[in-house]
């Protein structure tokens, strides 16, 4: 089964190294650095039964972290890349085994009399030995002696000789952790300002190919490039961005300059180079401007049939990072991706699903293709892939046709990888949240996640995000799985997260203009702030509601403890303006009022700017309002009931409200675009989960959807009151 697949990712040893002059031990005990590939070349995973992925799945999963990001360098129309980057495909005539042995013997004879030129020549020739001889050369003590002699007079080498030696090290696959590389890095750092741009980029490329981190060299290189960025030609620009991405960081000022160069050269870039640009900026945590992303989207949309899967995924990563919604690009993706997904690796598939989820863009054909392909590839999925896939479907609130198979397969693989998930608790919690959004509750996994051991592991760095995830998980299982009797979070942790979320809500959500306007008007309509509570009913769902309780007679019940009996509320409840008397009510209830009102309201004259249906209001909205309504509130029985109710307001402070079994509990939600999938009215996962749980707790969810409420914010107070009255009392 899936858990029997080997983990083909290599983990590099971090053991301490000996000094540069004791290289013999380094070579004796160091094995060649294995490529950090998902599946190393010419190596199949040992499948232990017939249920494992077949050959086609294996071929789709072959990925090299060294070679794949460098595909743009192989463009035949850009021969300039040959002088900027290392390539093992352009080997000259091989050195014979006999000649190699002779060279190593010469080292023992010449010893310290070896000149820099001879040493460089020896390394070059040894680097051209047949591949099957490389391991024996690395293990030879005479080769270790040659390495030791090479670092004794580094300053005497020419630039070309020093670069040639580094190139030989790459061919020989010297372990990146070898101690002599520290000495070589120092020497290259010393020479940066005297080397050409091509040589500097080539050296950086070889360090990357070796897998050696050289932060000091890159720091000086970037300083050099900040002064010469305007002189970069197109291949140099792309190669530099690639190097920056692999180094994971660069000065923001330099990235802004390079972005302007990308914009200048955009028409000349091919699709693979565009993918390299997006990946370089993405890996270094630098976004591209919306203007540039829209131009990139236009170009890739036109050529999407020709772009490689790898470059396409990299472009998607940048759209995800910048949150730019390029609808033409996304629609083209929906046409192309379903046919490509079966031939893509699981990482690429994950990034497509994750990008769609991050952009809140639901394309059912794309997500169906993902769901249909992944069950057969699940053995190749890392913990991160499982997490992002489950989160993507959950966040988009989408159930594919094969939902049961999809979720069962991925859940089973989570169980198989529990050991790996303990190293990455954030991925484990992301998996579970994705499942919970989709209303799947693997109780054994949830119990493990809420165990004291795992909670301690997940919160040891005091990461608020993981605490929030645990809180959401705990609150959800408590509401939706009453049969669950397993672990729960401690009261202390729940209180801590609740307070942090409430603090955020008070500072951000509760004070949004559209929320405040709704709260104020509802308070006015119901008779005071004691009837409306602007808070998070379910803190674990991370958003607020306007809570209102009505009795069976649709009269509001005071619930806001913070305002009940306060001086401010008492003053608000005093009669102001027109005194509501029996005479006034009799006049309002007069049998002739309908005729009078009909004459006054039937055809009101509207001033310019007071038209009832503005262009920003949906056409169907007018059905919600009284068609004869202009600037006043329609006199209805409900309104009269509310007016009459104000006469009975108690003179003494109200007592603390108590929960009533016969009350209607309303959760009024002011939604916005971020609660829905892009350009649709399909609710996202977290917000769907919240409504589901509120309803389970007996609340009636009343939504003020943004497509109705936001246009109304510019309308008259009377129109807003009428809309809110209709929403609340017809719910």
Q: What residue ranges belong to the model's regions?
A:
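N-terminal alpha-helical scaffolds in RNA gene-expression factors, predominantly in nucleus-encoded
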Residues: 1-703, 707-731
């Amino acid at each position: 089964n899936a858990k029997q697949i080997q983990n083909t990712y290599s983990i590099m040893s971090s053991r301490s190294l000996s000094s540069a002059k004791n290289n013999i031990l380094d070579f004796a005990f160091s094995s060649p650095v294995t490529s950090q590939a998902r599946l190393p070349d010419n190596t199949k995973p040992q499948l232990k039964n017939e249920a494992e992925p077949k050959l086609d799945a294996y071929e789709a999963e072959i990925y090299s972290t060294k070679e794949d990001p460098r595909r743009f360098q192989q463009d035949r129309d850009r021969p300039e890349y040959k002088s900027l980057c290392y390539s093992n495909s352009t080997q000259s005539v091989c050195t014979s085994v006999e000649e190699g042995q002779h060279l190593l013997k010469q080292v023992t004879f010449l010893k310290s009399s070896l000149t820099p030129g001879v040493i460089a020549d020896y390394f070059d020739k040894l680097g051209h030995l047949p591949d099957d001889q490389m391991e024996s050369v690395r293990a030879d003590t005479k080769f270790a002696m040659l390495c030791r002699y090479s670092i004794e007079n580094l300053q005497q080498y020419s630039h070309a000789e020093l670069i040639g030696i580094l190139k030989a090290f790459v061919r020989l696959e010297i372990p990146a952790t070898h101690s002599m590389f520290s000495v070589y890095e120092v020497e290259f750092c010393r020479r940066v300002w005297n080397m050409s741009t091509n040589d500097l980029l080539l050296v950086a490329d070889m360090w990357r190919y070796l897998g050696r981190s050289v932060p000091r060299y890159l720091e000086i290189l970037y300083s050099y490039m900040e002064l010469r960025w305007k002189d970069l030609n197109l291949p140099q620009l792309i190669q530099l961005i690639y190097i920056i991405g692999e180094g994971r960081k660069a000065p923001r000022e330099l990235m802004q300059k390079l972005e302007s160069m990308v914009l200048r050269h955009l028409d000349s870039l091919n699709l693979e180079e565009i993918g390299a640009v997006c990946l370089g900026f993405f890996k270094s945590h630098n976004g591209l401007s919306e203007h540039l992303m829209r131009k990139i989207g236009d170009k890739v949309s036109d050529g999407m049939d020709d772009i490689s899967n790898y470059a396409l995924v990299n472009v998607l990563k940048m759209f995800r990072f910048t949150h730019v919604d390029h609808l033409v690009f996304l629609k083209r993706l929906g046409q192309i991706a379903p046919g490509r997904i079966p031939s893509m690796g699981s990482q690429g598939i994950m990034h497509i699903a994750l990008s769609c989820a991050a952009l809140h863009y639901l394309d059912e054909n794309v997500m169906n293709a993902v769901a249909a392909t992944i069950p057969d590839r699940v053995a190749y999925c890392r913990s991160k892939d499982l997490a992002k896939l489950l989160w993507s479907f959950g966040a988009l609130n989408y159930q594919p046709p094969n939902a049961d198979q999809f979720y069962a397969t991925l859940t089973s693989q989570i169980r198989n990888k529990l050991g790996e998930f303990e190293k990455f608790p954030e991925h484990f919690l992301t998996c579970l949240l994705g499942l919970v959004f989709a209303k799947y509750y693997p109780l054994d996994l949830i119990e493990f996640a809420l165990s004291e051991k795992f909670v301690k592991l997940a919160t040891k760095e005091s990461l608020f995000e993981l605490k929030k995830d645990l809180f959401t998980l705990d609150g959800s299982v408590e509401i939706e799985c009453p049969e669950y009797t397993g672990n729960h979070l401690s009261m202390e942790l729940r209180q801590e997260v609740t307070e942090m979320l409430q603090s955020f809500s008070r500072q951000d959500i509760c004070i949004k203009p559209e929320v405040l306007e709704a709260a104020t008007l509802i308070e006015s309509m119901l008779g005071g702030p004691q009837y409306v509570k602007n808070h998070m009913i379910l803190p674990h769902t991370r958003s607020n509601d306007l809570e209102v309780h009505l009795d069976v007679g649709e009269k509001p019940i005071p619930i806001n403890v913070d305002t009940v009996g306060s001086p401010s509320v008492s003053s608000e409840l005093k009669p102001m303006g027109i005194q509501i008397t029996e005479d006034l009510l009799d006049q309002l209830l007069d049998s002739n009022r309908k005729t009078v009102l009909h004459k006054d309201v039937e055809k009101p004259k509207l001033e310019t700017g007071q038209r009832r249906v503005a262009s920003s209001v949906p056409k169907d909205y007018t059905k919600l309002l009284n068609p004869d309504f202009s600037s006043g509130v329609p006199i209805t029985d409900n309104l009269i009931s509310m007016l009459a109710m104000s006469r009975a307001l108690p003179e003494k402070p109200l007592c603390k409200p108590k929960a009533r079994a016969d009350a209607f509990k309303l959760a009024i939600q002011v939604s916005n675009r971020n609660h829905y999938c892009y350009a649709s009215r399909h609710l996202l996962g977290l917000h769907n989960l919240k409504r589901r749980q509120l309803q389970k707790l007996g609340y009636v969810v009343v939504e003020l959807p943004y497509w109705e409420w936001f246009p109304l914010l510019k309308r008259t107070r009377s129109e807003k009151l009428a809309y809110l009255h209709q929403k609340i009392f017809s719910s």
